[in-house]
């Protein structure tokens, strides 16, 4: 299964996967407005490979059912919160 991957011009770390290069017909207009101008990153064969940040089976399922897959960036790390939690844990030990 081939798919084309595009990065968002408006939302850093956001990628859109579609089954056919430059065919955004299955992507809702509201999503395309929020996504901004798509910039083609690559076309890949999803068979027999893995992806760094997303489950490949979810990508395939979404491409088949919805006609696209939207990859959002991971939430930012809250280092201060992690530090506070470690300090609290150390006090309890």
From Swiss-Prot:
Pfam family, one: YcgL
Domain YcgL: 1-84
Stretches the record annotates as Disordered: 72-93
Transmembrane segments: none
Cross-referenced InterPro entries: YcgL-like_sf, YcgL_dom
Alphabetical list of HAMAP family matching this protein: UPF0745
Protein name: YcgL domain-containing protein VV1_0131
Originating species: Vibrio vulnificus (strain CMCP6)
């Amino acid at each position: 299964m081939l798919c084309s991957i595009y990065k968002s011009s408006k939302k850093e770390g956001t990628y859109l996967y579609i089954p056919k290069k430059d065919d955004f017909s299955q992507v809702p207009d509201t999503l395309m407005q929020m996504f901004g101008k798509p910039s083609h990153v690559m076309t890949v064969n999803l068979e027999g490979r893995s992806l760094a940040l997303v489950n490949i089976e979810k990508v395939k399922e979404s491409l088949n059912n919805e006609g696209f897959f939207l990859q959002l960036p991971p939430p930012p790390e809250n280092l201060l919160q992690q530090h506070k939690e470690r300090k609290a844990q150390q006090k309890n030990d």
